[in-house]
Amino acid sequence: MIIPWQDIAPETLENLIREFVLREGTDYGSVEVSLQSKIDQVKSQLEKGEAVIVFSELHETVDIQLKAKF
């Protein structure tokens, strides 16, 4: 189930994105990117509709996925 990011309290959204970024360990190339920059990038993807927040009822987990997967 897709959860609209606008329906999530700002502090909760920030924590969700932070947890996602720390878990993913995304490779940003040879340039070091700050944690806040990574969080801002994911938030921007959510705002642009490029990424969505997904709740798995089966596993009772929340994740952020690229919208193209849905």
Swiss-Prot record:
Coiled-coil region(s): none
SUPFAM superfamilies: YehU-like
InterPro entries, sorted: UPF0270, YehU-like_sf
Recorded family membership: Belongs to the UPF0270 family.
The protein's name in its UniProt record: UPF0270 protein VIBHAR_00073
Organism per entry: Vibrio campbellii (strain ATCC BAA-1116)
